[in-house]
Amino acid sequence: MAQPDSSSLAEVLDRVLDKGIVVDTFARISLVGIEILTVEARVVVASVDTFLHYAEEIAKIEQAELTAGAEA
């Protein structure tokens, strides 16, 4: 079995930091119709520059949704 090439690992890490990865999770546990536990998580792996860029865009989307909801 061939060993993984360290340069390809560095390329993958560079790409992840450049583009970022977001894992958005929502889980609810209920027993007999009674909600016992709710877990909501958003995990972001990115460079600071990438995160700040996308955080600004997400804030714009959320603000537009709030404005549209207030007008309705």
From Swiss-Prot:
TM region(s), chain numbering: none
A GO-annotated cellular component: gas vesicle shell
First and last residue of the signal peptide: none
GO molecular function: structural molecule activity
InterPro entries: Gas-vesicle_GvpA-like (IPR000638), Gas_vesicle_GvpA (IPR047870), GvpA (IPR050530), GvpA-like_CS (IPR018493)
Keyword set includes Repeat: no
Keywords: Gas vesicle
Cystine pairs: none
Compartments, record wording: Gas vesicle shell
Lineage: superkingdom: Archaea
Quaternary structure note: The gas vesicle shell is 2 nm thick and consists of a single layer of this protein. It forms helical ribs nearly perpendicular to the long axis of the vesicle.
Function: Gas vesicles are hollow, gas filled proteinaceous nanostructures found in some microorganisms. During planktonic growth they allow positioning of the organism at a favorable depth for light or nutrient acquisition. GvpA forms the protein shell.
Additional remark text: Gas vesicles are about 100 nm wide and 200-400 nm long, and located close to the cell surface.
Assigned protein family: Belongs to the gas vesicle GvpA family.
Protein name in the entry: Gas vesicle protein A
Native source organism of the sequence: Haloquadratum walsbyi (strain DSM 16790 / HBSQ001)
